[in-house]
Each structure stands twice: as structure tokens, then as C-alpha cells.
């Protein structure tokens, strides 16, 4: 469209201008364009129904020329809608996301947890919490929190610490720079996360004469920062000097779409590749250099190599405490680090040699600079032996024949066998992410979707919705524990409403398996971690399940097909039925609360009470003092 077409102004409300602007925003990388904000989630109340709600309706039934559709989906919970948007963004490798709107007060505050999840995971979401009247004439309005010390602060200021960009629109003119900066942050690979623009309910509906040029198509180019020559030379020198280098591949490798380059680099150099939760699948599990998960929930192969490594090459990792085993994983006293990361904040961790660059660009440059380099034969043989030994343990965990209830690892083994290379498995919290990181044999970077930065119970059900919207061609399988289910089940209704075909696997063990085991190991005797009916004495001694609680029936009441099974063979048959169905299906299976889980080889720092009258806690504290001795800063 010519520049002349954008001369003059158009009179729109702030909300209408927001939707029209967002409908024409695009992201681009490697020559491929995407609609940056292809749709909207929203729950309406008096704070947004006549503002953004009206604007979305108008976009749907009376759009103007040059205004793209902004399809609206009605969710059931404000936190859930943000989780769905985050999962959508993660599945698109951060090239797209959804906008989310909520009403004033409790509706908007419900989005804070989702915002924190997105920012912690470095994935973009765009949030529009509604706010109190900017004019302050109706004051206090319904659902407004009053602060007697200032009239400036509202509950939406809670979004500030969990957002990568926060603004409040008190005048229409402020919208223009605010939205432009919002798009900048959403598409910045180093700065992305939750972007929050609070909108007072009166300002949303206020009319203004907007420059037409504001609504032209804009393409936001997602950058691939090249490697600085001097930084490359320093990294190459470190690698050449190392005898036992180990790559730790994080989510940044996948978001950069650098999997092919990682495989080629590993093949050329022989350097083994361990993965984090976010990075699993960046290298296929059957690659000769793939050594699986590393850290507190990693496997023996990755952890044994990490124990002795003299150089850690971190690619796109934020080094969470699970990756470093709370700073006990890398035991070589002379270990050094080279960190390749698009964010200097992450590249600087562990006193590393910093390579602030895109993962793909850096791997290409390193491969060229190390063309004549390969680890020695003895190290290659050790890598192969570790891989073989751990593969045998994985196979055992997948085929335990445990009874009377199956172990959840057997369910994971069945799923690992049944899922296709482009299908997606989703999880976030409890004992399952630990088992999955240790055991899951990821074939592609698409397949493994575990949110373990914020590890938010309740993520799994809405995340399946978001992932399926992003990849309708993939089978999306979300593994849900009964603890997570009871936190946030209501987006099952949204899935049924939208006719979204996903598969939920509900593992019911009547408690918190992960925290129960952690509680026991820290001397707290699984207190408050089992779903049991209170008896006449201590509920810890009462093993009776709560009568009348039926999660399978509850899921069916949301409009989901439910198949109840009790054995692994029945589970496989049920999965095949769910796979060919055109409706969302939940497969319900009871599993053993007490495992068994994969063998662990690394520690996690969870502090134990330093003084106690309980013998179990006293013993746990002695173990804790012993186990934390290897902790150190990497300087």
C-alpha cells in the first residue's frame, strides 16, 4: 500500500486502535514472516467488556479494509489463558504469541502467575489487564484496591516485577509509543517475556484521532547477533585446551532453531551434548554424542561426564539450580565455562568466557574455527560406554512390570514408543518432569515441551490448547497429575468449546509424589502431601481415599471423552483410540505414589530445619550438612 494511503487520521477508541494495530504486526526471521499476534484470549468484566471486548467484536463482524482478523477465544480462567499463550509462543519458537485481556481487580491479578511463568521461561506474552478510571471520578470503583498513601498505585503494579515491559495508558496519545515498545520487547530474543500494558476502563473506550500510518503493516525482524571475532577466538582457545569438554544445550538452542548446527558441531568435534529441560530434543537422543539430561534430575550418562568435565560449553541455558545441581554438579576443581547466549545476563553466569551471540550463528562459526579439532579416542569411548549403560537403565525403567499399580515411568515408556517425531508431550510440575528429563528419548526439538523454569502446577491443561493452536498437525499429549488437575482444570471446557483435539494423560496417585518424597527425605514424613480423608487421629495415619472424588467423571463433565485403564497394555490400546478420534480425550490411569523413579546421581539443595524435636528431621539435617559440602561458586 502506498504512503499516500496512510495520510490523515482515523477516529477510533483506544481499544479499537489497539486491535487494529496488533492485527498488522509481523515477526520475521530467516526470510519467513508470521503474524506476531494471530489471536486473542479474553475474559470480560466491567473493566474491559465495553473497551477491548467491543473492539474485538467490531474486528470480527465489522472490520475495515486493511484490518486483519483477530480471532477471539473465550477461556475459563485468566491464569489459564496466559499459560495457553505462553505454550503457543514456546511451540512457535517465540515467533508468535496471543494477546490476553482481563477485567479489573481479581481478573487481572489472576494473570500475574502466567506473566511470571512467561518471563521466567523467556517466552513472549502480551497482557492487557484492566485498570481503574484514569479520571478518578468514579472512585473507588468496583474491584479497586485503595491505597491511602498514594492514588497512583493499583493492583496492576504487581505485574511490574514479573514483566519485561510494563506501562499504563492514562491518555490515548500514550498508546503509540507504548505499543511500539511492546512489539520491540516481544520480538527481542534477549529481552522477551511478559509484556503488560494496563488499560484504565475509561481510557479503553475513549475516542481519539489516530494517524493512519500507525496502522500500517510492520515487520519486526528477530535478530541473530553474530559472534564477535575476539570472543570467538577466546572460546576456541578454551575448547582446544580442554581434555573433557561437555556441551549443555538449553532452550535457546531450540528457540534459535539451531538443532541441525548443534548436531553437525557435535559430529565434527565429538564433544558430548547434555540437555536441560528446555533444551531436550535439540539433539536427537540416538546421536552418538547425545548423553541426555544433566543436573538434579539428569541421567547417569550426562551427570558422570559433567562431574569430570574440565570445560562446560553452555548454549542457550540459564543454568537453573536443577542444571547445576545447586552448584555441586561440576566437580572438577579446574572446570571452566564458555557460555553462548543471546542474553549477556545468562552468558556471564559461572564466571564464563562470554560469547553473546545467536546460538546458530555461534555454532556455525565454532565449527569452522575448530575444523581440525576432535576429542581424543579415550574420551569418545567413555562417552559411548556411558550412553550404553544409561540406555539399559532407561529400558528397565520403561519396562518394570511394577504392581499392583504401574509405575509412572512405564506410562512414559509407552508414550515414548507411541508418539511420532513431530508429536508433542507436555508437562510442568511434580515428579513427572524429573522422570521425563532423565528418561525421555526425544527424537526432534518439537517433541519435548516441559515447562520447568517456573514449574507451575496448572500449566499442563491450558498448555495443550496453546500448543495445538500452534501446531494443529501434531498430536499434542499433555501429562497431568491429579494434583495439577485440581489446581486448574477449567480450560478443558475451552478445549471442548473450540473443538480442539488433544490427548490428556491423567496419572492419579492420590497425592503429591514429588513433594512427598522430598518431604520424606528432608525429615518431614510426607506431611500434607497425600489426599486422604481425615480420621479420628492424625491424617498421616489414615490411608482412606476421599470418597466421592472422581477426577475421570469430572473431566467427562467438561465435555472430554474419558477412557479409564489400569494396565500398560490397556493404556496403549486407549492411546491408539484417542489418536484416531477427532475429539479431545483423557486417558485415566492410577499409578503408584511411591514410584519407583529413575536412579538419581545428583543433589538438589532444599534446606532442612537446623533444629528440631523430630528424630527424622535431625537425621535429615545431618545428611544435608554432609551433602552441601561440595557446593561452591564457579569463579
Labelled PLM ranges:
Residues 249-251, 315, 429, 480-483:
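Glycine-rich beta-strand-to-loop/alpha-helix junction loops that act as flexible
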Residues 266, 305-306, 408, 488, ...:
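Active-site-proximal structural scaffolding
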Residues 35-36, 378-381, 478-483:
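Short alpha-helical "patches" and their helix-cap loops
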Residues 163-166, 394, 398, 562:
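Short amphipathic alpha-helical interaction patches enriched in hydrophobic/aromatic residues
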Residues 136-150, 347-348, 356, 363-364, ...:
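Thiamine diphosphate
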Residues 38-52, 387-462, 467-468:
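Active-site diphosphate/adenylate-binding microenvironment
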Residues 2, 6, 170-173, 211, ...:
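Phosphate/pyrophosphate-binding active-site segments
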Residues 2-374, 378, 414, 418-421, ...:
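N-terminal alpha/beta PP-like core and its mobile active-site loop of ThDP/TPP-dependent enzymes
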Amino acid at each position: 500500500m502506498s504512503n499516500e494511503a496512510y495520510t490523515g487520521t482515523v477516529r477510533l477508541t483506544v481499544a479499537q486502535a489497539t486491535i487494529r494495530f496488533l492485527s498488522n504486526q509481523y515477526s520475521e526471521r530467516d526470510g519467513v514472516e508470521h503474524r506476531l499476534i494471530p489471536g486473542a484470549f479474553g475474559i470480560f468484566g466491567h473493566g474491559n467488556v465495553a473497551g477491548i471486548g467491543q473492539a474485538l467484536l467490531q474486528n470480527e463482524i465489522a472490520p475495515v479494509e486493511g484490518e486483519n482478523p483477530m480471532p477471539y477465544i473465550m477461556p475459563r480462567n485468566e491464569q489459564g489463558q496466559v499459560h495457553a499463550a505462553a505454550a503457543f509462543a514456546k511451540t512457535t519458537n517465540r515467533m508468535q504469541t496471543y494477546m490476553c485481556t482481563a477485567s479489573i481487580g481479581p481478573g487481572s491479578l489472576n494473570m500475574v502467575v502466567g506473566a511470571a511463568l512467561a518471563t521466567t521461561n523467556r517466552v513472549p506474552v502480551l497482557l492487557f489487564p484492566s485498570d481503574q478510571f484514569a479520571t478518578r471520578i468514579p472512585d473507588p470503583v468496583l474491584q479497586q484496591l485503595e491505597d491511602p498513601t498514594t492514588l497512583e498505585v493499583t493492583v496492576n503494579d504487581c505485574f511490574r516485577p514479573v514483566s519485561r515491559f510494563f506501562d499504563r495508558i492514562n491518555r490515548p496519545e500514550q498508546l503509540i509509543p507504548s505499543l511500539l515498545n511492546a512489539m520491540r520487547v516481544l520480538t527481542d530474543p534477549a529481552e522477551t517475556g511478559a509484556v503488560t500494558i494496563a488499560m484504565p476502563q475509561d481510557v479503553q473506550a475513549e475516542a481519539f484521532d489516530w494517524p493512519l500510518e500507525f496502522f500500517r503493516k510492520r515487520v519486526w525482524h528477530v535478530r541473530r547477533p553474530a559472534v564477535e571475532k575476539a570472543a570467538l577466538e577466546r572460546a576456541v582457545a578454551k575448547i582446544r585446551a580442554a581434555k573433557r569438554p561437555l556441551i549443555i544445550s538449553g532452550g535457546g538452542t531450540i528457540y534459535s532453531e539451531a538443532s541441525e548446527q548443534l548436531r553437525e558441531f557435535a559430529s565434527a568435534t565429538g564433544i558430548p551434548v547434555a540437555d536441560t529441560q528446555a533444551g531436550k530434543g535439540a539433539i536427537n537422543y540416538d546421536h552418538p554424542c547425545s548423553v541426555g539430561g544433566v543436573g538434579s534430575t539428569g541421567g547417569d550418562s550426562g551427570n558422570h561426564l559433567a562431574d569430570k568435565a574440565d570445560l562446560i560449553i553452555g548454549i542457550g541455558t540459564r543454568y537453573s539450580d536443577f542444571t547445576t545441581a545447586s552448584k555441586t554438579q561440576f566437580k572438577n576443581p579446574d572446570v571452566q565455562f564458555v557460555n553462548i547466549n543471546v542474553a549477556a545476563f545468562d552468558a556471564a553466569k559461572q564466571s564464563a568466557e562470554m560469547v553473546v551471540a545467536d546460538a546458530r550463528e555461534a555454532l556455525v562459526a565454532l565449527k569452522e574455527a575448530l575444523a581440525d579439532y576432535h576429542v581424543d579416542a579415550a574420551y569418545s569411548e567413555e562417552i559411548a560406554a556411558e550412553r550404553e549403560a544409561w540406555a539399559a537403565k532407561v529400558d528397565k525403567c520403561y519396562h518394570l512390570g511394577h504392581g499392583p499399580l504401574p509405575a509412572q515411568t512405564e506410562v512414559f515408556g509407552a508414550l515414548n514408543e507411541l508418539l511420532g517425531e513431530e508429536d508433542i508431550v507436555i508437562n510442568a510440575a511434580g515428579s513427572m518432569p524429573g522422570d521425563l528429563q532423565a528418561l525421555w528419548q526425544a527424537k526432534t526439538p518439537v517433541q519435548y515441551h516441559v515447562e520447568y523454569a517456573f514449574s507451575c502446577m496448572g500449566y499442563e491443561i491450558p498448555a495443550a490448547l496453546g500448543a495445538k493452536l500452534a501446531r494443529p498437525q501434531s498430536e499434542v499429549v499433555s501429562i497431568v497429575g491429579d494434583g495439577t488437575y485440581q489446581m486448574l482444570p477449567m480450560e478443558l471446557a475451552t478445549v471442548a468449546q473450540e473443538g480442539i483435539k488433544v490427548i490428556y494423560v491423567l496419572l492419579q496417585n492420590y497425592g503429591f509424589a514429588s513433594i512427598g518424597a522430598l518431604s520424606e527425605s528432608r525429615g518431614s514424613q510426607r506431611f500434607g502431601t497425600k489426599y486422604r480423608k481425615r480420621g479420628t487421629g492424625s491424617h498421616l495415619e489414615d490411608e482412606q481415599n476421599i470418597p466421592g472424588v472422581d477426577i475421570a467423571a469430572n473431566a467427562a463433565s467438561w465435555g472430554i471423552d474419558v477412557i479409564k485403564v489400569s494396565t500398560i497394555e490397556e493404556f496403549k490400546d486407549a492411546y491408539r483410540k484417542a489418536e484416531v478420534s477427532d475429539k479431545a480425550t483423557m486417558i485415566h490411569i492410577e499409578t503408584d505414589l511411591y514410584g519407583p523413579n529413575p536412579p538419581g546421581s545428583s543433589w538438589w539443595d532444599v534446606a532442612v530445619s537446623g533444629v528440631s524435636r523430630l528424630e527424622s528431621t535431625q537425621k535429615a539435617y545431618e545428611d544435608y550438612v554432609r551433602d552441601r559440602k561440595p557446593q561452591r561458586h564457579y569463579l
